[in-house]
Amino acid sequence: MRFMVTNLRHVGLVVNDLDKLILFYNKLGFKVVDRKKEEGSYIEKLVKIKAVKLEWVKMKLKDNSILELLKYHSPSAKFEKKVQESNRISWSHISLTSNSIVDTIKKINQFGGNADKEYLFSPDGNVKVIYCHDPEGNILEIVEEL
């Protein structure tokens, strides 16, 4: 059998305020499908952190895309609320497709995120698009296909 990656399983995002981010992403259409606290040798070996205690929540969209939110209780992750720059070395953004960019922008702002009201049209005219931020400053790209 030939080696092959078959799909993107999920995107994991370390967060400071788990419940706030669950509410935010729920308002964008994600539904909680699983939530668990973990500690012990298995999770220590997996994440390579001694005496780790964490909690994770898996949230799913209708198309089965999964977002995993992780809260490290011990040792806690350093949190510095700042808007992430799109050109930093690391992951850049989470791109979400919406059927109404205007309504999605309203929800993002209503539930603690930050989005300008003005979106762009792609040069080919096929999509409306905007970069914005969740309540902890992570970059979201919202795309509406035309």
Q: Where would I find each of the regions flagged by the language model?
A:
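Active-site/binding-pocket entry motifs
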Residues: 65, 75-76
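N-terminal beta-strand motif that seeds the catalytic metal site of vicinal oxygen chelate
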Residues: 1-22, 31-34, 91-96, 146
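Core segments of cupin and vicinal oxygen chelate
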Residues: 14-64, 110
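Vicinal oxygen chelate
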Residues: 2-3, 35-37, 55-60, 67, ...
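Non-DNA-binding regulatory cores of transcription-related proteins
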Residues: 84-88
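Exposed loop/turn and edge beta-strand positions of beta-sandwich/beta-sheet ligand-binding modules
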Residues: 7, 52-53, 90, 126
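A short, acidic/glycine-rich surface segment
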Residues: 40-45, 76-82
